[in-house]
């Protein structure tokens, strides 16, 4: 069975003064998470310069492994964003 896991990150980019500033923060996070073989995309608040929503997807055959990978990605995002992570959720799509 194929298991798809989705991690959604709500980010407040408090130090951003422009869309360019926000995109630098989002791009750095996306690049770091993509190094782990995850699919990453900015999915909401595209025109807001102090908010972002990033979705991270993982696919596998074992739900436990997919959940573990997404929890590590969540921890890494929290570490990199240094307090700017407002909310996160993990869901499994079967």
Where would I find each of the regions flagged by the language model?
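Flexible hinge/switch segments at interdomain interfaces of large molecular machines
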Residues: 1-3, 47
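Short glycine-/aliphatic-rich beta-strand segments at the starts of folded cytosolic domains
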Residues: 3-15
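A generic structural motif
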Residues: 13-18, 60-62
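Short amphipathic alpha-helix segments
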Residues: 20-39
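RNA-interacting cores
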Residues: 29, 50, 81
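A short linear hydrophobic-aromatic micro-motif
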Residues: 37-44, 86-87
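Short, charge-patterned binding micro-sites
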Residues: 41-62
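C-terminal structural segments of small proteins and small subunits
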Residues: 58-94
